[in-house]
Amino acid sequence: MKGQRDRGTEGGSTGPALGPLNPRSLDPSPVLQATDIWRVFETGAERLEILRGVDLEVQRGQLVAILGPSGTGKSTLLHVLGALDRPTKGRVVLDSLDVFSYPESKLHELRNRKVGFVFQFHHLLSEFTVLENVAMPLLVAGMARTEALGRAHEVLEEIGFVSRLTHRPAELSGGEQARAAMARALVNEPAVILADEPTGNLDSTSAAALVDLMVRLSSERKMTILVVTHNQAVADRATRRLHLAEGKLSEEANH
């Protein structure tokens, strides 16, 4: 029964087999390349260099943990990679698209098609059900409601979370909200998912379940996920661990 499957996956480390690979997941080219990224803020005579010549290349199917002290620019880097913020200097290529060659008016469409976002505060819309929240990126992109809801249902089924379809966010636990947010990030089959402290407000059981889901998505679906985190469990299970300090990005040794 579906309800039984939900209970097993929401609290544990195993779940149903995820859906078929997106054909582009077999493409050997990097899904994300950032070259000489600078983000500088100037206020009067003060110049604050948040990112200083960051270079990054990410292959499809990698789960990349971005670590570092608070206030070192990890979220800023994620925002630049996801085209939420323009770099002062540098280039980002996402799924073969030169992101910042597009005018501002086109960046929203690019983000909606190519990037799935998951944040510490999951920003589910309180007036809509779980199913409607997950379908929202498709509805915003103009997909017919019936088709969008159908696709959202498929994604929720894939991750083993169909027992709360008609519930609203206020009726969900923190872990359930996190799973709904991850499903919403997946619904467009994005090129990359960018997650900013997604386990930050979760208890240990819910955090472990979300980490397990991210690992399964990268290994079984070849989904590319970059996650800013202070959670050691995420770092321990990531494909790669990057460290950001003083505006510079370095890679930790394989573990």
Put a short name on every predicted segment.
Residues 1-5, 10-40, 250-255:
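ABC-family P-loop ATPase nucleotide-binding domain
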Residues 30-244:
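ABC family nucleotide-binding domain
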Residues 241-253:
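H-loop (His-switch) and adjacent beta-strand-loop-beta switch element
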